[in-house]
């Protein structure tokens, strides 16, 4: 610290001051058909999701959302990112999902829709992140251990 400064104007010229880096603006990632892509995962389910401007139609594995996800709670889960972003009727969603059960698949589609929305409109990341839609849920089934009946349950023990 050999440099000393007596005024605030000299503060920026000191050698220890970091230079201001320009903030990079994130460009939308849209393909030739005008679609944005996002991959979502939950448990063992993997969803590949494409969104494009449209009327709000959601198609999963070639079927309408009402036929693929018959339970209303599952349809609510996949619509959450679109509703919170205020884009429920602005985008058509096409998704292919495989693996896991219906709840895991719905979570994977939700994650994929969130990622695709951010790819299409990067400013939505600040809206979706606080709701946890951008975060991959790390909880998966615990593996079975040898010497145990299940992951944690021991075999029945008889004292006598």
Swiss-Prot record:
Residues 1-37 are annotated as: Disordered. It comes from Hyphomonas neptunium (strain ATCC 15444). One of its GO terms (cellular component) is cytosolic small ribosomal subunit. PANTHER family: RIBOSOMAL PROTEIN S9, SMALL RIBOSOMAL SUBUNIT PROTEIN US9M. The keyword Ribosomal protein applies. Residues 1-18 have a biased composition (Polar residues). This is Small ribosomal subunit protein uS9. Pfam families: Ribosomal_S9 (PF00380). The keyword Ribonucleoprotein applies. One of its GO terms (molecular function) is RNA binding. Belongs to the universal ribosomal protein uS9 family. Keywords: Ribonucleoprotein, Ribosomal protein. GO terms for biological process: translation.
């Amino acid at each position: 610290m050999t440099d000393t400064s007596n005024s605030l104007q000299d503060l920026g010229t000191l050698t220890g001051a970091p230079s201001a880096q320009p903030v990079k603006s994130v460009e939308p990632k849209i393909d030739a058909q005008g679609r944005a892509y996002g991959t979502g995962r939950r448990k063992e389910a993997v969803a590949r999701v494409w969104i494009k401007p449209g009327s709000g139609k959601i198609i999963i594995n070639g079927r309408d959302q009402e036929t693929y996800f018959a339970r209303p709670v599952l349809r609510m889960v996949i619509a959450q990112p679109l509703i919170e972003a205020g884009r429920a009727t602005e985008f058509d969603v096409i998704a292919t999902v495989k693996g896991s059960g219906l709840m895991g698949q719905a979570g994977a589609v939700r994650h994929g829709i969130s990622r695709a929305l951010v790819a299409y409109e990067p400013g939505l990341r600040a809206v979706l992140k606080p709701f946890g839609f951008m975060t991959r849920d790390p909880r998966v089934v615990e593996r079975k251990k040898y010497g145990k009946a299940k992951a944690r349950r021991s075999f029945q023990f008889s004292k006598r």
